[in-house]
Amino acid sequence: KITKKMIKILDCTIRDGGYYTNWDFDKTLVDQYIFSTNELPIDYLEVGYRSYPMKGYLGKYFYAPIYELENLKKNSIKKLVIILNEKDIRLEHINDLLGPIVGIIDMVRIAIDPEHLGRALILAEGVKKMGFEVGFNVMYMSKWSQYGNFISELKNVDSIADYFYMVDSFGGVYPKDVIETIDLVRSNTSCKLGFHGHNNLELALINTLTAIEHGVDIVDATISGMGRGAGNLKTELLLTALNAKEGLDVNFNALGTVVNAFDGLLEKYQWGTNLPYMISGSNSLPQKDVMDWVTTRFYSFNSIIRALQNQKAKVKDNERLPVFEAKDTASEVLIIGGGKTAVEHAQGLIELIKSKPELIVIHASSKNATHYKGLANKQIFCLVGSEGHRLEKAFEDLGEFDGLCVLPPFPRKMGTYVPSSVKEKSFELAFIDFTEKHKDSHTALALQTAISLNAN
């Protein structure tokens, strides 16, 4: 049977879940989390970052203030952990950041880019001398073979790190990869091993169980899988599996209570995998952009997937178009958006348009274009993201289309889709210079087009 001495479990809900809440958590929730985990076979709780002030707002658990750590220490019977971002922290910073928490925090983990392992060793040696356990969270596990001397340098970890974590940053490894990586690391270091999985392909559980079966010493999980992008292995799933498979003693009342406590956040943020995360995981592409695109709900899945395909191909964009040069100018333009008022007032707007033959109509979105078919006035259609698909629907595969299409300047971060039948009528703006914000939005594209037409 598995006991806590055979495999250690680290729950990093507060730290990894902070990517959704900006590291703000309600005190009542944190108190319940601490109370419940006291009753569960979890060894470590990772409760945030320690950092100097960063640009923009980041919540309490990104900085893990001393008063909060003291409160957690008072209430938790578990070992407490914070993590440092190696890219932001140097040896000369650790006395300020870690000195005040000696005796409060048990382990300091360091998030490490494999490219900077040597630099991380210097930082970690200083952390170790302060009396902390040290964990190396080495990212981009699926790409380690691309990092020159990284594997051969692992021998230098032995005397410094207590745990060397294999981090599946992209959520794209399979059990076979886990086994091969464990063997590879073991052949170069005697450090205890850990595994941190992501759930893009819903393999976090099997990958973690595989890691346990092949002798890793510590594994990570989070309540309800709360974590960056597609999320992590669910703590409740891991504990349930180990209870059934290995007889690990689990207090299911306490487990159910803490899972229920996070239901509100799960409903609000809806973390978990979806098609874009599956594609990014399968192709070892960064989750940060995907998380931004998915959570804002501004981009369609087609746009996100096209952007990911461009990343995989290492191209800025999949298509370049001729630059839009306004052959006609218009003292007046009418910009029609995708809202319901453009439908409600279509009849009146059509009468206005007909009364002004020189007026140019700019469709910020093609959503309502069907209501404005057949006009003699020149019409321009802004194609942002997957608007090309919407245009096809509006004009029945574009058999009735008589207009121009304008796209944002090259490169377009979400890639390019232009229906083949209108490609010869499609152009890209040379620039958008009237604003620095939301340059890839429908509104910005429509307004810059109007400016290009010298509209008043």
Residue ranges, per PLM feature:
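Gly/Ser/Thr-rich loops at beta-strand to alpha-helix junctions
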Residues: 113-117, 171, 200-201, 228, ...
